[in-house]
Amino acid sequence: MFEARLINATILKKILDAIKELLHEATFECSESGIQLQAMDNSHVSLGSLTLRSDGFDKFRCDRNISMGMNLGSMAKILKCANNDDTVTVKAQDNADTVTFMFESPNHEKVSDYEMKLMNLDQEHLGIPETDYSCVVRMPSMEFARICRDLAQFSESMLICCTKEGVKFSASGDVGSANVKLAQTSSVDKEEEAVIIEMQEPVTLTFACRYLNAFTKATPLSAQVQLSMCADVPLVVEYAIKELGHIRYYLAPKIEDDES
């Protein structure tokens, strides 16, 4: 038997909004330590990874490891039926071919449940090697989302250049060019407004804007985003989910003569 409960449906809605554009279907791997999801996007360019710790749930029970393949579009439709302040419970029997979502109103006067068929998905689990990154940038997630959105107007690709002076985002195309430079914040009252750069050596890499913009769908989950970069290694874009876990996106840099 698997059962996981969150007091507030909003967080699960936000998590799904963060991954459903990139991943159409995925397997939720449930164990006593929590829920893991890892899947390549449909064009096999980027990887999405979700970790939700069992101790972050209001209630969590997993008698044996269970893999639940789900269509994320269908799951999003079901979650749309929940009010933001509903308690949401996800349940599945061992070896079941369906999963149940139960929504309960705060006053316990309304309870609704939705059953969804599970899918058998053939997904390999990719080992992600531990990497010592040359540059790690922490910055406000809304600022990163805005930069990705703005620079995508100029080009399909965005250059991220990290030095000890700061981090620079650039794009150039037929219309013209755009540059946004952020210096490390010297003093900041609110931690979530800080720009913090940890640099071992300078890095300049180019990435496809459309994937970066897809990653920023996770912005509502976290006030800060962390970008980890190293030459010839996929970029890691990480959003922490407070007291519950994190979402990480991996995107390989574009090669100079790569037109894709």
UniProtKB/Swiss-Prot annotation:
InterPro entries recorded: DNA_clamp_sf, Pr_cel_nuc_antig, Pr_cel_nuc_antig_C, Pr_cel_nuc_antig_CS, Pr_cel_nuc_antig_N, TonB_box_CS
Recorded GO CC terms: PCNA complex
Any one GO MF annotation of this record: DNA polymerase processivity factor activity
TM spans (from-to): none
Subcellular location: Nucleus
Biological role stated in the UniProt entry: This protein is an auxiliary protein of DNA polymerase delta and is involved in the control of eukaryotic DNA replication by increasing the polymerase's processibility during elongation of the leading strand.
Family to which the UniProt record says this protein belongs: Belongs to the PCNA family.
Subunit structure: Homotrimer. Forms a complex with activator 1 heteropentamer in the presence of ATP.
PANTHER family: PROLIFERATING CELL NUCLEAR ANTIGEN
Full protein name: Proliferating cell nuclear antigen
